[in-house]
Amino acid sequence: MNTDARMGAGVSLKAEHYDQALACNLEGLWFEVHPENYMVGGPRLAWLNRIAERHPVSLHGVALSLAADAAPDQDHLQRLRALCDQIEPVLVSEHLAWSTWQGHYHPDLLPFPRSNEALQRIAENIQRCQEVLGRRISIENPSHYLQLQGHEWDEIDFLGELTRRTGCGLLLDINNVYVSAHNLGFSATAYLDRFPAQAITEVHLAGHSDDDQGSLLIDSHDAQVAEPVWALYRKLVSRVGPRPTLIERDDKLPPFTELLAERSIAQSIMTCPGVLP
């Protein structure tokens, strides 16, 4: 696990909070952004450059479409490489999903059957990305809403094999685990107990919501981290030790101080997971 020693708990960075992020001097604080919002330059990139001078920054992509039927878009990869060269992020990560297929774009992160063919294709795409970027990337475990047919691999084994073949890291999203466990009916604790600890480069904590019928949980990133997710996080840190941890928030954005309050809980758990903050 190669991560920046300065990284404790961080928060998602949104334009509404640029001023406060720049002024904040909390030890161990870092920020994560979606690189697609900064590739075109402009005022956003100027702000990010200033913040990156003071705090570690991580890039969490949503558009590489690693599980697609074709290689990642080369123009997009080159823009991502240019942003990496400029910002020097401490971590670069992407979702284990697809959003393009047979030349058509779908504005979502979509699931796929974990087949041998998918494993080979995704491993090749990860290797291409790492070669172009000149750095290791991390892959995030997905959230699930229904049981797909055609799986040939258990998810933990699939992720572990990707790390073995490509040397990539893993971004462990605990809210995704909790949501998926609820929706598909498996044990979140058992999943985390099997997750390959040595490959974890980053942890995500986020809020979720109920669907309209109330039967599914949605990985919505629009609420505070739920107590069951905090409980899973405490167990994880007790088992594997502290890892850079992000409070992920993308919608219904609260005041910056509220994000820092959640960040403080994560920081306390990283320091002493057995004590309730």
UniProtKB/Swiss-Prot annotation:
Disulphide bonds in the chain: none
Transmembrane segments: none
UniProt cross-references to InterPro entries, sorted A to Z: MbnB/TglH/ChrH, Xyl_isomerase-like_sf
Record Pfam families: MbnB_TglH_ChrH (PF05114)
Name of the protein: UPF0276 protein PP_0992
NCBIfam families named among the record's database cross-references: PRK05409.1 (NF003818)
Family label: Belongs to the UPF0276 family.
Top-level taxonomic group: Bacteria
